[in-house]
Amino acid sequence: EDVARSLLPNNMAVEDCNYLLDYFRLTRDNRLIYGGGVVYGARDPANIERLIRPNMLKTFPQLANVKIDYAWTGNFLLPRSRLPQLGRLHENVFYGK
């Protein structure tokens, strides 16, 4: 728990501004979800952990000896502007994409 708080002290979700972006946040049980390793127009990599881990360690070098419990691939979509889109549907209903 202390390690998790040191990674993201304000417990905010983060997306970097690199062209091949990485994104990360903490779960309720203080696990780090770290995404990235984008491969445009190609097949899913055979080993996503091998693709993601170097960038994760650039961001969080203190995780060098931490085991990755789960790794998966999938589609990630973003607008042409590459900027997040936020809005309000109703008084108490907000969205982000």
Residue ranges and their predicted role:
Residues 1-27:
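Flavin-dependent oxidoreductases
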Residues 3, 9-11, 33, 63, ...:
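Residue-level signal for well-ordered alpha-helical segments
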Residues 4-5, 34, 44, 96:
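Short acidic, gly/pro-rich beta-turn/loop elements at beta-sheet edges
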Residues 17-22, 27-32, 37-38, 48, ...:
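Residues forming the flavin
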Residues 40-97:
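C-terminal catalytic lobe of FAD-dependent flavoproteins
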